[in-house]
A protein has these predicted regions:
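Generic signal for short, ordered secondary-structure residues
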Residues: 1, 7-8, 17, 32, ...
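Short, contiguous hydrophobic alpha-helices characteristic of membrane insertion segments
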Residues: 1-2, 10-11, 52-60, 134-138
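Sensory modules in modular signal-transduction proteins
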Residues: 2-30, 34-39
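Juxtadomain coupling helices with adjacent low-complexity linkers
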Residues: 4, 8, 119-139
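Sensory/regulatory domains in signal-transduction proteins
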Residues: 37-127
Length: 139
C-alpha cells in the first residue's frame, strides 16, 4: 500500500482534511469511526461508536441503506451514489447533498465494511444566483 510510511497521526490528519464527511462501519455493521465530529451535517453522539448502524441511522432512509449494505456484503454492489435536498441552516433553505457508499474489501475481495461519505454543495448554490468571473488559472 502506498500509505504504509504514514504514521497514525498523519493518517488521522489526512482523514480530517478530506473535503467530505466520512462514516465507516465494519463487517458486523457496527459504527467504527467518523471524521469532522464538530462540524458534521449529520451529527451523532459519541455513544454511536460501536453501535449497529441500524440503531442510529435516520428511519426515512434506513431501508435503502440496508439494501445497499446487503448488496455490498453479497458482492453484487461496490458503490452507491445519490443526491438529497436537505435544509442545513436555521433558515431552512435546502442544499444539495451528495451521499456515496463504498464497499471496503481486502485484496482478496472479502467484505470488511462500508464507508459512507456525504458532502454539501452550498458553494454551487451561490453560483446559480451570482455572476461569478473565473479568477483561477485553471478554470
Amino acid at each position: 500500500m502506498l500509505f504504509d510510511r504514514m504514521n497514525e497521526r498523519m493518517v488521522q490528519a489526512m482523514i480530517e482534511a478530506l473535503p467530505v464527511e466520512v462514516t465507516v462501519i465494519d463487517a458486523n455493521d457496527e459504527v467504527v469511526g467518523w471524521n469532522k465530529h464538530e462540524e458534521r451535517l449529520f451529527k451523532r453522539p459519541l455513544t454511536s461508536m460501536g453501535m449497529n448502524f441500524r440503531e442510529c441511522h435516520p428511519k426515512e432512509s434506513l431501508d435503502k441503506v440496508l439494501q445497499i449494505v446487503d448488496e455490498m456484503k453479497s458482492g453484487t454492489r461496490d458503490k452507491a451514489r445519490f443526491w438529497i435536498d436537505l435544509p442545513v441552516n436555521a433558515d431552512g433553505k435546502k442544499h444539495k447533498i451528495l451521499i456515496e457508499f463504498f464497499a471496503l474489501r481486502d485484496h482478496d475481495g472479502t467484505y470488511l465494511g462500508c464507508m459512507g461519505q456525504h458532502k454539501t454543495f452550498r458553494i454551487l448554490e451561490s453560483f446559480r444566483t451570482k455572476s461569478v468571473l473565473c479568477r483561477w488559472k485553471y478554470c
